[in-house]
Amino acid sequence: MEFLYSDEENYLKDRFFDFFNMNVDKDKYTSIGICGGRSIVNFLSVFLKQNFSFRRSHFFLVDERCVPLNDENSNYNLLNKNFFSKMVDKNLISISKFHAFVYSEIDEATAIHDYNIEFNSRFNIFDFIIVSVGEDGHIASLFPSRKLLFSDVEGYQYEYNSPKFPSKRISLTPKSLFGSKAVVLLFMGVDKKCALENFLASNSSINECPARLLKEHPNLLVLTNIKRDESYAGS
């Protein structure tokens, strides 16, 4: 694990961009997993700034809320409005490379099956994943003390009882998250301080802090603007 702290956000974004370039060859067919949220949009903006062209990369959501694509709670909607549409306008990516999960209340099983097939027909694993960590330590839609946190299958599954609204979501499973080739974890904002300390602590469990699922990943970059407590300075 490489751990980087800075109160200079641009420095962290530059380190993210460097790590991305070390792990993703834009001339090769690659899969990139992203979650929603303001921190993710902020870090992705470095690609706009750099006029980075995604010729062969495909983006998939690591989690999504079971809402219409135009709903204000949709991760796809947030990311499309604030990042992908701008990349399309600059001719840096085709919108077809951003794969949405289309939820169907009438046929939930087919909806998630189709999204799994959409990924599996193109890739075996994710080449690169960037996820932000929630206040409770959750990543994607893997929340503390939820059954999905301990799933041993690959791909996407439903979370029917999320502690955050809306309660019904899909999420990439722990096995698929850990199986990715490279991972970036973001702990951004003082409200994530407890989550960061639980992530670093030796006596904390995955059940308390799901982000710990990725702590032993062989190619993990952790970025934070949260000043660490002295007790964790040597972690």
Swiss-Prot record:
| Gene3D superfamilies registered for this protein in UniProt | 3.40.50.1360
Q: Per its UniProt record, what InterPro entries does this chain match?
A: 6-phosphogluconolactonase_DevB, Glc/Gal-6P_isomerase, NagB/RpiA_transferase-like, PGLS
The UniProt record lists the keyword Flavoprotein: no
* Alphabetical keyword list: Hydrolase
Which domain of life does the protein's organism represent?
Bacteria
Q: Which GO terms describe its biological process?
A: carbohydrate metabolic process; pentose-phosphate shunt
Briefly, what is this protein's role? Hydrolysis of 6-phosphogluconolactone to 6-phosphogluconate.
Family, as annotated: Belongs to the glucosamine/galactosamine-6-phosphate isomerase family. 6-phosphogluconolactonase subfamily.
Name of this chain's protein: 6-phosphogluconolactonase
Q: Which organism is it from?
A: Borreliella burgdorferi (strain ATCC 35210 / DSM 4680 / CIP 102532 / B31)
Q: Which gene encodes it?
A: pgl
